[in-house]
Regions:
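ATP/NTP phosphate-donor binding region
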Residues: 1-103
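A glycine/threonine-rich phosphate-anchoring loop and its flanking beta-alpha core
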Residues: 23, 122-220
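Active-site histidine-anchored catalytic micro-motif
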Residues: 107, 136-140, 281, 285
């Protein structure tokens, strides 16, 4: 399957002309052979000093299929044990990469891609995406989720110039990784609702065509969950296609708004380990658990609006003590304050918010019920409860605050 990126780079009904940086997207068996051909005699032959970034698990799984590519590149294999997209991993790459690198190949899943795109951005070199699992939607985005000085941030980075997703590789990834990809997509229900509410309340820029793209990704996966979980190659390709569509939606907007909202903020809090210890869970697993928690809270708010129990009041920074208690003990308080400036809530009057309540209720009512979402995730083998990711029940309330 070849995805024509030009289909997404055109004048849009939202009034903007979306920019797409990726030149080629290939999702099929033998895609890495096409990559090797392009590096040898095609559009990538101009790059003469390429760096592959992968981890120990990925190297072992791809060594045979990608032997010719590895032979022509500097290959940097990071220890998969405890690997995070953080300053430590970035320093390892920077300290070991050759000075004349002119192309980076990210061979792996989400963590490897975040590290690679961040390095590519900082060193102003292009990168190629070689996804090895359909585990998330970050392969073609222009942002990276990086932990810097203890704070999980979404930082500007670069999109790949090409994607070579080889079905012979990613369809054979552990089912847990595939389930994590389904989890990441199912959370888009929350993301799109958040974006619609922000547009309603603050007038934030909103693109209906991008929303349709995310909805197409959701529909693609929902209709094929059973076959995807059974490892059917054609359906795994559809999952990868849906994840790349979601990433293209972010690339079109220029940030993560269409695909990362309240549920991702909750997971970033967990990643910072200020209200919990280390979690042995994949990003997608944390996202599906957070999405269910947020969905339950949203449905509770919608019910309160319906019953006339929800009213707007002037914004007051009532959580200062909670912030101090949560982030102060790790010396992160000032950095967190900077991340959240300016405080948007200060600009929203209670009168305006009160007028928006019915619209907010309507948007939330469009979301699937908690039971429907739970069953979808259960069918796909996704994480659903805090216990599934090793989180204590006591962390739920501060996570939502």
């Amino acid at each position: 399957m070849r995805v024509d990126a030009d289909d997404f780079a055109r004048p849009c009904s939202c009034g903007r002309e979306h920019q797409i940086a990726v030149k080629e997207i290939l999702i099929e068996a033998g895609a890495v052979e096409k990559l090797e051909e392009e590096m040898s005699e095609g559009m990538l032959r101009e790059y003469i000093s390429s760096l592959v970034i992968c981890d120990t698990n990925i190297y072992a799984a791809t060594e045979e299929l990608m032997e010719d590519i590895y032979d022509r590149c500097q290959v940097l294999v990071l220890d998969a044990e405890g690997l995070q997209a953080d300053r430590h991993a970035i320093k390892i790459v920077e300290n070991n990469m050759e000075e004349d690198i002119d192309l980076i190949l990210a061979v792996g899943a989400g963590t490897i891609h975040d590290i690679s795109r961040y390095i590519a951005h900082n060193y102003k070199v292009p990168f190629i995406s070689v996804p090895t699992a359909a585990s998330g939607d970050g392969f073609v985005t222009t942002v990276a989720a990086i932990t810097l000085d203890g704070v999980k941030k979404t930082v500007p980075s670069v999109a790949p110039i090409c994607v070579y997703a080889d079905t012979d590789i990613f369809s054979k990834a552990p089912q847990r990784l595939t389930a994590a990809g389904i989890s990441d997509l199912m959370a888009k229900y929350i993301c799109l609702a958040d974006w619609k509410i922000a547009n309603l309340v603050t007038g934030e820029y909103f693109c209906r065509e991008t929303v349709k793209l995310e909805e197409k990704a959701l529909k693609t996966v929902k209709s094929s969950i059973q076959d995807i979980t059974e490892g059917e190659e054609d359906e795994c390709e559809q999952l990868m296609y849906a994840l790349i569509l979601s990433g293209l939606a972010m690339q079109m907007i220029g940030n993560s708004r269409p695909a990362s909202c309240a549920e991702h903020q909750v997971t970033h809090l967990w990643d910072m380990e200020v209200i919990n210890g280390p979690l042995d869970a994949l990003h997608g697993e944390k996202v599906s658990v957070a999405a269910l928690l947020v969905l339950e809270e949203y449905k509770r708010i919608a019910a309160a609006i319906t019953q006339g129990r929800c009213h707007a009041k002037p914004y007051e920074n009532e959580d200062e003590e909670l912030l101090k208690e949560t982030f102060g003990k790790k010396g992160l308080l000032e950095e967190i304050r900077k991340e959240n400036e300016p405080e948007l809530l200060e600009t929203i009057s209670p009168q305006h918010l009160e007028k928006c309540l019915n619209g907010i209720e309507e948007i939330i009512d469009e979301l699937p019920s908690e039971q429907t979402m739970f069953r979808l995730l259960e069918k796909a083998g996704c994480a659903k409860t805090v216990y599934d990711i090793g989180l204590d029940e006591s962390a739920v309330l501060p996570s939502l605050r």
